[in-house]
Amino acid sequence: MTSDALPTTAAAAPRLPRPLAGALLSNAVFGGITAVGVPVALNAAGLSKVQIAVFFVVNAAIAISYNTLLVPRIRRAGYPRSALLATSLAVPAGLLLVRASGGHVVVLYLGGALMLFVSTLVPQLFGRVAARGGGAAQESSIARLRAVLISGYILGLILYALLAQAGLDPLLAAVAAAVLTTVCATGCPSTPAVDPDARVASAAARPRLVLVFVAALALVALLKSVDTLRAIYLPLFAVSSGVPAAHVPPVLLASAVLELAALPALTRLSSTRGSVLTLAVVALAGVLAFSILSSTQSYAALLVSQAVYAVAAAGYQSIGLLLLERTSGGPGAGASAYMAVVQIGTVLGALLPLVVTGYDPRIFLLAVGLAATALLLALTLRLAGHRF
């Protein structure tokens, strides 16, 4: 596909098989619970702001290694079910260690390393989806996959809020969700292994656009850095401002519900105008959302800013994945590239706020700057004639 070639309409994607959809859903429930649960638990265990940031940075480095070294091997082997089962089983074991660590460094980081096998699950599941169809159906496939992930994330946030309000440990529910992912994974079949000769022929037929691919990686990393900053520091900022921990998930929940509403419109925009222009719109939403939050600190402003941010959250994950699929050179390769590069964004989003003392709202000016940089990069790509 050239940079200007776009399907005029999005073909209907086949339905996701039930075991695969179940694995995606339960994995997303895990993500929804731990998005708030892990930072809050680390804070409650007495870890400082720097220690929490370092934990996420180390985890990001681990996830990068998994997705650049392990996942490509799994992809070439045809996404064997044994690999999916092994990696999914490591996730609940890791979270149990994190929960039991009490801040003990060795146990905490061993648990984090095991838990981060979660970063390999979506590439393995999406690789199975990509193997069943591609081309013009990509928007529909990714939108359907993303809708399942958002729904699970919403359910995870609801569970966190209910359990926290009841005085129960939400992380145990996350462990149960991770175990359910493994159960569903038993019904996810392998795909045919990639023949080396076919891989070489495919690369020759569709040469990698190196500079555009690197720019796409940078664009996704910037948008992920904004999302990581939000994921780590928004709950901590809210709690330090006097907002009860149980009142934070409703903010994220409202944003996630609006993600579902924004996703079809973003998919249509990508299909007709290209993923690069769509990501420019996504970055603009990030600029607006955190401009609101950095200037006004009320709970209402928190809700409004995250409602606006819903466009960014829905777009960078679905359209960003689509852009990498189209520039990475092969079905399923974009998913592992995505999961690797978002870890770089995780490092940026975790470390940059350390230049701000405490949980000051000036942290969110950094998010504005990162989103604005992503906006400029997307516009530069678009003006250069790249649509994808």
Question: Across the structure, where does each feature detected by a protein language model lie?
Answer:
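Symmetry-related core transmembrane helices of the 12-TM Major Facilitator Superfamily/SLC fold
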Residues: 171-189, 363-382
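A late C-terminal transmembrane helix in Major Facilitator Superfamily
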Residues: 329-359
